[in-house]
Amino acid sequence: MTFAQSATGKERRFPQLTMDQLDESQKPLGEQVMKVSRIGIAGPYNPMLRSPVLGQRLLDLFHYLRWETSVPIRLNEFAILIIGRQWRSQVEWYAHAPLAAKAGLAPEIIAELKAGKRPSNMAEDETVVYDFVTELTTTKKISNPTFARAKKVFNDQQIVDLTAVAGNYVMVAMMLAMAEETVPPGKEPPFKDGEK
């Protein structure tokens, strides 16, 4: 899958690579990405391939935070969507909203979050994730009451993993924003220009 233009519709900052274009330092990373990514080497992988050593380390981190994390997948994907919405990251939302729905996150929660609202009717664990991730990313700290609520729902490893998921997907959103990556051709961007 290739993405033709940048998010702004102008020439791409990083032209989309194909597997045939990868040099010897990029090829092993590209092959690993192709095995696990439903968007191939597009999205964040396109700029990551420009720095293959970093890209490999990030891919290892992504693997843990997506498939081996101690945070239940529904909540993990919810945390990713919270970051995607904060950053209005077209690719993050495009890639993860279906995964969140498949993992059992209620469509109403996804829709309200996408609209920029605090979701209503969240389960206790979802409320904890929303409050924790939102507080950490907006105030740059976690208050004692928020931490205490998190400790009632999650163990220490889960709290650390949740923090890492949030931080990782801020980095992914930054990478996507820097490269002006967007959704595949013919697909509707989740966030419209001018929306808050």
Regions found by a protein language model. Name each.
Residues 2-196:
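Hydrophobic alpha-helical segments
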